[in-house]
Amino acid sequence: MSRRNPPGSRNGGGPTNASPFIKRDRMRRNFLRMRMGQNGSNSSSPGVPNGDNSRGSLVKKDDPEYAEEREKMLLQIGVEADAGRSNVKVKDEDPNEYNEFPLRAIPKEDLENMRTHLLKFQSKKKINPVTDFHLPVRLHRKDTRNLQFQLTRAEIVQRQKEISEYKKKAEQERSTPNSGGMNKSGTVSLNNTVKDGSQTPTVDSVTKDNTANGVNSSIPTVTGSSVPPASPTTVSAVESNGLSNGSTSAANGLDGNASTANLANGRPLVTKLEDAGPAEDPTKVGMVKYDGKEVTNEPEFEEGTMDPLADVAPDGGGRAKRGNLRRKTRQLKVLDENAKKLRFEEFYPWVMEDFDGYNTWVGSYEAGNSDSYVLLSVEDDGSFTMIPADKVYKFTARNKYATLTIDEAEKRMDKKSGEVPRWLMKHLDNIGTTTTRYDRTRRKLKAVADQQAMDEDDRDDNSEVELDYDEEFADDEEAPIIDGNEQENKESEQRIKKEMLQANAMGLRDEEAPSENEEDELFGEKKIDEDGERIKKALQKTELAALYSSDENEINPYLSESDIENKENESPVKKEEDSDTLSKSKRSSPKKQQKKATNAHVHKEPTLRVKSIKNCVIILKGDKKILKSFPEGEWNPQTTKAVDSSNNASNTVPSPIKQEEGLNSTVAEREETPAPTITEKDIIEAIGDGKVNIKEFGKFIRRKYPGAENKKLMFAIVKKLCRKVGNDHMELKKE
């Protein structure tokens, strides 16, 4: 692109697949050329040379065709003027060919003194600072922190006007009393000296007289008269007219007269700050003059005086031992000077703002995009010159509203932290008006899912469990209520507990007698429920059974897993008819009574199912109505008993028979009868033709043939007859 092609190297043929947007321009130019040729070669337009036959008659000034012809003329003149620098010429257009525009790079000499910056406005609409901004527009670098608090150009101009008006007003107020107190002779003589241009001593004498008069007039001001002091305006006026010597002499005369006046009256002269006059150089006020000499605060000792170092002991010529110290080295990194310079230049961003400050754009330097942007400049000969962009800036608009500073935002947040949001108060008001205290308190209770209606009647009630509330522990911090008789203390404690239970807790409970179950909920821990028992039994099956097993509730070792699971999921089947005495002692909770009352309306069909079968004993589970038809305890329909039911009713005493007692009796019968010995036939029948799970097979054999001897025989027979299939199964060996 930077190479300049000679005229001979261009054959004039453009590419055939060029973009069609050039076609419209080519057709327009051909039309203009044809029209100019029809007008004739004799007439010529003003300002157009007659050498070309294509240029003809006069065209109207406001006609766009005339502007096109004028442009062609300028291009032709530019090509002739630039013939020494460039050999490129615009080729005569052919209707069958496309136009070619040469592209060249800018010379290195021109690029040295040129810096090109691109400004991009990040906005959806087109931004034109000349039309969209309020002129004049200012582009400068400045600190953008707290930009909303910085003054705009309009505010600065307004304040400058106010300050200038204030200064003029103050000068007028100062000059008004001074004009009346000035001596006429002094002013006339001063004006004469200035107009006549007399020598410096003459002006000096005049200023001395004026200053002397001013001092004499200032003395009564100390004593309390109303005559104002002389103003130093005369001295400044002399200085403004070029009489500098007069000002210095006037100052000297003022000092001498003031000193004589002070000595004469014996009182110090008080000078106001406004009357002190301007300093020699206001920029150097408060600075200390340095003469280059070193100032020492310590007193100098002459010869014959006491030496301050006389009390210091001599060192004896000893020196401190210095080892071979290694020279400390540090690593230095050479910084790029261009990067350092760029960081210094871009420390403050560019800010473009208009006069009123309504349009403020802040530019950020984009280092990565500077290499991909160029400018194409149109030259006089129709070619383009490519100029690389040095820097690219992206301008973003600043907010037109004032934002909060960090301190103001923290104060706002501190104020809001103690307040409650408005919507929350409204929500609380709706709750208070639409619901009652009973509903609001009941929301805190957690509902527990009910189990099936079939298992509801068989659920054990823990109300018979009584906790010892009178037991005292060593870590109890509660002191006894009354020191005295223990029996009276116990009665008072029980009375207080009853009152607490009978108290109506915010209208949530009905007026009814407290139950023992509620006492457990308030003052003690409830007995482990069915879920807890199920979890405990599941833990006992694991390897940590010794930690969770108890002496009271031991699992029967002769029960199978199916029996244990059935026992966990179901309540005991065999219950007594005559359980009135037990039901009186057991008082169910009101919640359970309510559930039973609701379940009573639900019609349930009587069901009967087999719970377990072991050792020719079948345990049935069913409804109470069906179980009443069977005799109590163990029953064998094949055995005939010559005992009437009436005799059984008179002889037997009703006593509660539980499932655990029946299990214990069966266990005792098993212990009395000797265990059968296992044989190979039993193993073959148990395994069968297919695969068997090893664990289930072992449990089945140990349950059917208990004993250590049968266990050893089982291992020997299994090793002899079976083979392992996988990790968990086995089968009989095929012969």
Curated annotation (Swiss-Prot):
GO cellular component: nucleus; transcription factor TFIIF complex
GO BP annotations, alphabetical order: positive regulation of transcription elongation by RNA polymerase II; regulation of DNA-templated transcription; RNA polymerase II preinitiation complex assembly; transcription elongation by RNA polymerase II; transcription initiation at RNA polymerase II promoter; transcriptional start site selection at RNA polymerase II promoter
Residue ranges, compositional bias (Basic residues): 584-595
PTM note: Phosphorylated on Ser and other residues by TAF1 and casein kinase II-like kinases.
Sequence segments annotated as region (Disordered): 1-68, 165-263, 297-323, 446-465, 471-606, 631-674
More info: Present with 1920 molecules/cell in log phase SD medium.
Protein name (database record): Transcription initiation factor IIF subunit alpha
